[in-house]
């Protein structure tokens, strides 16, 4: 991590968004919940996940082995890394995934429940994130069927607040300011909560009519918890979509950043719609800035391809204020008619333009097994990210046709 922070500093990248939790692991020590690391940071052979998570990805069969499947950052590690980053003028934003992508936390708190249920039922259920009676049937994009926190249980909010408070305490000890915690919010599968008695009771009590109302309930509750602790919330684009106007009025004032990632054709208008709606936006365009996308379609290339292929020219071509013209080829590699790309699309308003805070690159680690893999997928792609972060108005943006192509080619050659 220190090597990566050094690389960021060299390229004048000023914010590290640290994805500390997800399905396959919980990677930060929280003293109040030792199960999060005793269970949630380890993967191996198990029949009940009482001492570790099931194996996934490469290896992960021995929960005690020193592999990429196992391990976490201790409290002392994290505090030291916060200071190291601050010395290099880099802000660290921690992410605690919720309510989806939360399987490691859910399994860990279930293990805690099972540890105490025969001796102290109240203590066992104090921080439980799942409802034993929930019969909901769903599958996430990654094919998990039990990765979403139950948003109707008071124990969920107790758990989240204590985690946030411990994170804030680490920042205080490090002498580093904390303004926001990223709450995730992405990719909650359809079908969640439909078989949960507690969720159905909450819907009836609050007059809710659709499952999304529960997601709205969660993010507004969490925004209030964050505010109570002197923080603003951040989240992926889903945290700002589909809400009532009442919820939008609340969330606009409590949001530090909405991270817009899904810019594949058909969804790319969402970015400017969110900015025009008054939310602060960070541009995370999958087609330009997902560093875990493969460089190309060669079978030996490591990386994913669901969002297209990303190389240094693709990251360089991103236009923050003309996102529809940010991809110069389609998924099949055919040239895009850039002059027609914006027709009929949502226009970024003057007020919306003020809400574009910056750009961010993502590197998810499903296909990575070592730091060499990190370096391979980041370089030289990351240079395009840095260029666009510091030069949001490249010379070719206002040009069209052959002039635009010539200006782009010249800038790319110099870059």
Enumerate the predicted regions with their spans.
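Aromatic- and acidic-residue-enriched carbohydrate-binding clefts of CAZyme catalytic domains
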Residues: 24-87, 102-152, 191-210
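Active-site groove signature of glycoside hydrolases
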Residues: 97-98, 134, 141, 145, ...
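Substrate-binding groove of N-acetylhexosamine-processing glycoside hydrolases
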Residues: 154-161, 165-181, 201-415
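Active-site-proximal loop/turn and secondary-structure-junction residues that shape catalytic pockets
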Residues: 20-24, 32, 96-102, 155, ...
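Short beta-strand segments at enzyme active-site cores
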Residues: 15-20, 92-96, 101, 178-182, ...
